[in-house]
Curated annotation (Swiss-Prot):
Composition bias, Basic residues: 89-103
Lineage of the organism: Eukaryota, Amoebozoa, Evosea, Eumycetozoa, Dictyostelia
Name listed for the protein in its UniProt record: Rho GTPase-activating protein gacT
Coiled-coil parts of chain: 580-656, 715-743, 839-952
GO biological-process terms attached to the record: small GTPase-mediated signal transduction; sorocarp development
Listed SUPFAM superfamilies: GTPase activation domain, GAP
GO cellular component: cytoplasm; plasma membrane
Region ranges (Disordered): 1-72, 89-117, 388-420, 432-482, 508-571, 686-713, 759-781, 965-1009
Sorted UniProt keywords: Coiled coil, Cytoplasm, GTPase activation
Amino acid sequence: MKNIFRRSVQIFHKDKKEGDKQDYTGSSGSSGNSGTDRSPTSSLSKKDKKHSKHHQNESYSGDNSPTLSRNHHDEIGHLQYTANHHIATSHHSHSHNHNHNHNHQLTQPIQQQQQTQHVNLASNNYYIRHIYTNNQYDETTQIVMNNGIPFIYNPNARKIFGVPLTQVPCRAGSNVPIIIEKLIDHIERTSLNSEGLFRIPGVDLTINQYIKLFDNGEDVDVSPIEPYTAAGLLKRFFRDLPVFVPQSINKRVVSLFIDEEGKKKPVDMEILSNLRVLVHQLPTVHFEVMQELTNLLGKLMSRSDQNKMTISNIAICLVPTLNCVPAIVTYSIQMHDFFYNEVFPQHHLYYMRPYEEKLVESAPTQPINIMTTSGGEKRYSSRPASITISGLLPSNGQNNSPSSSTITSTTITSPHDSTAPITFTVTTTFSPEQQQQMLQQQQQQQQQQEKQSSSSLSQSQQSIQPISDTNSTKSDRRTFRVDPNLDLTQYIEDTQYNVNRNYLYNGGPSGTTGTTPNGGSLSIGGGNGGNGGSSLSVGSGGGNGGSSLSVGSNTSVGVGGGGGGNNTTDQSKIYRRSVAYTNNEDTKAAIQQIKEKIDRYSKEKKTREEKEREKLLRYSIDLERYKDRTINNKQEKRASRDINKEIEREIEKKRLSPRERLNLFGLSSSSSSVNSTLTRSTANIISTIDGSGGSNRNSKNYGNGSSSSSNRRYSNTINQQLQMQLQQLQIQQQQYQQTQQSQIPLQYQQQQQQQQQQTTTTTTTSSGSNRFSSNRYKPVDLTQSSSNFRYSREIYDDDYYSNNNLMMFGNEQPNQTPISVSSSSAFTRQRSQSCFEPENLVLLQQQYQQYQQQQQQQQQIPFQANPQYSNAVIEQKLDQIRDTINNLHRDNRVSRDYTHYLREVEDLRSSLQKETVVSNEFIKNIELEDKLRREEEKNQRLIEEIHLLETYFILKEKSKAKRLSTTKDLLTRSRSPTLPSSINMSTSSLGSSSSSAYNNNNNNNNVPK
């Protein structure tokens, strides 16, 4: 809201626009004829009439020209229509009204097929001829001619965009322009839920096309326009207006909200009522357009949850376009009923429009049109409000005035239709003791009459019964009810009101009240009682005078000859009287009480709504806090989870040596990668040749783990490179074996071929690019013992791995240990050696031969128990593996906790830094306060010293003056001739002594204290 009021102040620092040259305060009466002059069915101009007379050799023009529809479905029919029209007028010279007789012929399909080509040529030729004859050849016509679109320019059409609002065409009986009605209706039906309406711009090309169509005078269909383009077209219309809100009203509105010093005033009901008065002082057309626009914006704001257009967003988007103070728009939207739905039927109260006269008149017989001094018809043509006070008629004639009545019910109607009157109804009830007695007597008489006339009233029952049913709710207010079977005329004659029957015929004098016994109504008129001319008779009986308005159960208006008299009335309204007052103090007091009650109810409703709004706001704030808390918790959990993953990833990275990482990622040289693959292949050979079940299981687990990890971690390109290197290595091995065939026996060659087949199968499953394929990882089968642990493999050094190969391969004889150790150590040494040296290959072959011999011997020798590798030793080894796994698990937990502790330490450190900064500032503030206090004390002491010095100097001056006066006295006495010399000497001595004493006193006073 601060930005809105800032914008309202900035508007009036700008230069006054050139378009605001009209004085709306005195010329709004001339706009009264806008309902007829600006209608689209207005008469033709002189130029159009002259053009229609010579229509034989010229083109048609004016408002009667056929317009092109925007729908593609009817385009061909309209083209044929225009072409046939021009061909007929150019060759046969028919009248201009001949155009409307061809519609039934254009729908025939045969005629459409025959004339399609001729129609296009005729329409385009006519368009070109029409442009050149009127000298209207611009960019639009060039585009139309290039594209072949038959756009007919109408030079006599009335412009809509960029003209004053009073010149825009409207419908008959309305002051709102047609374009605004169409666009607002389209937006209300289709676009209220569109997000960012009036904020997101539409398509400029489409907006410009529709502007040209509207300015050309065509009946445009706005239903196919998309929401944002329709809103942009409406904004363009308001932006092109010369003046929408006059600057005089804008300045007065700003003065309501901002004082002389430029400060914002607090908004209260007095300011809003003054703003309402200023809004009602707009010209009539501008007022109605503002009412329609704010109604649309209020509906748009009510759906701000979907379209995101709150009151501030609407003000930001539309206030610069409307060029008015934001308060006019914002408060009109938020309090639309307060600003535009009047309690009284008139458009404004009479004091809101001082330049309009005769706004309030006496109640006429028919609705009248309110006229201004300039003769223009205003838009509100309803009779003034009639105020009715109703009640029971008392038994005596003393309480005829409503001054002794009490208000029992009030009715206030405020319809949106301006032509319907608004009625204040104040119902009063008289219930004295005599009245109650009279009612009891009437009930007794009624019971007697029912017994007598039960057979004679069968016909009247059919006519009276429906009337009594319609007003049964009103009859419930009384203390008695009349039987519907009762004969009305007979009952009235038997009542005590027959005494006053002469009032019905004679009546009172002119201007007095006359009581009519028929219906018991009281009428006020300018004639003789109930039968006077131009009188208003309100009640159940109606009136019998000329030009009288009778209001009864069957309300009718009789104009001339007593048309409204002798109404068939309801029994429930027999004892009611209704009086119309124009200037009565009691009626004004009743209206004032009603207004106060309305204000009180509105204030209570406002306070209730404010409490509910505060409650909802409090709940929404709590909800937002809860949402923020949950989002922060989720983010913290996600961050901690990411940190734990990073820690695990780092731990897994540390398990690999740098050389193995290079081999896995393919970053090392070809020799090192081939060397690593060779070592892996040899290890796989040993694992596959071993006949024990445990080693086979280990090899299977090893291969499966490697294949699954390779699919997850490494790309297919690295796998292909490693396979190519393996194939090259196998080819080189085969070539070398061919050279050494003379030294190797045939059995060994067959075994070697089997070995190569096994290596190809195992290496393809492992795929070479395995993160866990090095000798530093030891596969362990812990299916029975360590199933609850997370890790199933352990990190070992090369020496540890080589020493435990015997246990894994199932070697059970002690004499075979040095050979297996040497073979495993030879395998591990292959990491740092080149695989292309023939000596290494020979050593491998020898080691393999020794290993095969050992296996054969093992098969021949029976099983012998080896105490070195018993079950206890194996369990010991398994316990060691479990311990290592537990240690690793503990290390992981410690690392996680450590990161969490580090984070907490960082948070504590940051909070401590903030607290230290705050504490330092607090200490500095305390020091400054102490310093200021000391300075103040010092200044106070200085001020006291200054006061003492001032008093000291004042006393010193006084003493000096006294001393001078005493010396003068002594001198005068010593010089007097009458005194003897002895006395003079004594006085001189006394004077000298006194002067010396005074000097001593002065010296003592000068001594600093």
